[in-house]
Design a protein with these regions (language model features):
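Structured alpha/beta or helical-core interaction and ligand-binding surfaces enriched in interleaved
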Residues: 2-126
């Protein structure tokens, strides 16, 4: 195999991998659009969303300033996503660090082919 052929094949592999990554992002973005339309119709609070770059993945982050509101937002979204997915989260975690911050994490492994992770950090107020 010549260097030119090797470079061409490498470029084709990179192009195919990039196209697959973008396809996964598009799948995540499409699901996010559907979820946001439902959220608006159901009166859910606005939260921050990130679309993953390596997999079909969405990360929702509850960031309300008041910690009790942040927890309420998390619970509202947890219930809504669970209802839409037809099941509760595949993984649920709640843990506290040494400063007293509690991290809430729910994850659905494959909701319409997309991994959804919902998080909220509840800081100790005082």
């Amino acid at each position: 195999m010549t260097d030119t052929t090797r470079r061409r094949l490498d470029a084709e592999r990179r192009t195919a991998a990039t196209a697959e990554q973008i396809s996964r992002q598009h799948r995540g973005a499409a699901l996010l659009g559907e979820m946001l339309a439902r959220a608006a119709a159901e009166g859910l609070p606005a939260i921050a969303w990130t679309i993953g770059s390596a997999d079909a993945a969405l990360a929702g982050r509850c960031e309300a300033r008041q910690m009790d509101q942040r927890r309420q937002d998390f619970n509202a979204w947890r219930l809504a996503i669970g209802t839409w997915a037809g099941q509760g989260a595949d993984a649920k975690r709640e843990y506290a660090d040494t400063s007293g911050t509690v991290r809430l994490v729910d994850q659905w492994d494959r909701f319409e082919g997309v991994i959804i992770t919902l998080t909220a950090d509840i800081w100790a107020e005082g």
